[in-house]
Amino acid sequence: MPDRTTTFTGIHFENPFLLSSAPPTESESNILRAFEAGWGGVVTKTIGLHPVVNVVGAKAKFMRTSCEDAYVSMKKRPGAALHSSWNWELISDKTLDWWVPRIRRIKEAFPDRVLIASIMAGSGNDKELRNWQTLAEACQDAGADGLELNFSCPHMDRKDMGSNIGKDEGLCSVVTEAVKDAARVPVWTKLTPATHDIVVEAAACFRGGADAIVSSNTFPALPPIDPETLEFEINVDGLVSSGGLGGPAILPMSLCNMARMCQAFPDKSFSGIGGISDFAQALSYVLLGCGTVQVCTAAMLDQAVGPNVIKRLLAGFDLFLEHHALDGWTSLEDFRGIRRDRVVPQSAVRRPAGDDYQGGYEIVEGYAAPDRPAAAKV
C-alpha cells in the first residue's frame, strides 16, 4: 500500500494535500466537510482582530476561454474551459472570538487532521506586532496545529497589511520574528508573487524564524471589461478595485517562483499553491521541492470544498507510487525536489553550435557565463 503520509515542519499529515485559506475554509461546516472528504489539512480563512466588511455582490468569479472563442471572460459560454478565478474578497468577516471555539470543536472532531490558522494584523507599530501575537496565542491555545501568516492578500487597503508586508523584506522579518516569539507551533509565511524578487522576501522570513514558506497567493489583477457595455464584468456601481487572479492561469508563474526559492533554500520547507486541480499539477510542485501543496479554485468549483478534487489527488498519488515502486519510491520524500536542479540560467542551456555562448553580448572583463550543467538523465 503506498504511503500517503508525510511530515512537514514537524507536523504529521495523513496526506500532503491541503485546502488553502480562502472562501472554502471560511466556516466550521465547510472545514468539517473538507476533512470528511479526505483532505490532509485545512488552512482557515484569514483571521484578524477587527472584522472586515466586504463589498456588496459577488466576491469571486471564474473566467473561461475556448479555442473557438478565445477571449477570456466571466460570462458563461458553451464549451468554454476554466481559465482562472478572480476575487476581491478580504479576510474573514468573523471575529477572533467567533473562531476560537470553532477551531477547538474542529480539532475535537478530527484530531488526526491538520488545522492551520491563517492570521493577519498590521505592521506599522509595536501595538500591531502585539496584535499578531494575540492572534497566534489564541489560535494555538484553541488547538491549531500551526500558523500561516498572511503576507500576501493583494487587495487590503491598509499599507501595512497583506501583500504590503510581503513586498517589504524588513517587515517580513520583523513580523515573523514577533510571531515566533509567541508561538509554540510551526509558523508558515504566505508570500505575495507581486514583488521584485520573492527570494529576498523568503530569505527575510527565514531570518525571522519561519518554519516554511507558502507560495503563492493570487496575482494582482483587474476583471475584463465587457466590450458591449464598456463596464467591468464585475463591479459595484460601476467601480472596481484590484483583485486577485488564481486558478490554472497562474500555474507556470507560481512554479517559477517556487523553483527559485527551492533552489535558493534547498534545505527549507515549502508549500506550493497555484493552479492545482489534479495530481499532475501537484507533482510539479513536489518535484521542485514542496513538502505539501494547497488547493483553492478547483475546490470552489467542486461543492465548495472539493470532495472530487481530493479523490483525484489521492488516486493520482497512489497510482504514481505504484508506477514507481520498482524505483524504490514509497513516499513523497523519495521524489521531492528531484527536478529542482533542472532549472538553470538561459545561457546554460545547450546551443546548436559551440560552447562559448555568453548571453548574446560582447564579453566584458569580469563577466563569467553560467556553468553549463551536464546533460540531464531521464
Describe each region flagged by the PLM.
Residues 64, 68-169:
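Active-site beta->alpha loop and helix N-cap motifs at the rims of alpha/beta catalytic domains
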Residues 286-287, 293-378:
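C-terminal extensions of enzymes
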Residues 3-4, 24-32, 99-102, 130-134:
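Short alpha-helical segments and helix-capping/turn motifs at coil-helix boundaries
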Residues 1-18, 100-108:
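N-terminal amphipathic alpha-helix/helix-capping segment at the start of soluble metabolic enzymes
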Residues 12-44, 48-56, 60-71, 78-81, ...:
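Conserved N-terminal beta1-alpha1 strand-loop-helix module at the mouth
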Residues 32-37, 41, 124-271, 280-295, ...:
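Alpha/beta enzyme core
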Residues 51-71, 223-243, 286, 298-328, ...:
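C-terminal helical cap(s) of enzyme catalytic domains, especially alpha/beta-barrels
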Residues 13-27, 87-92, 116-132, 188-196, ...:
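Active-site mouth loops of central-metabolism enzymes
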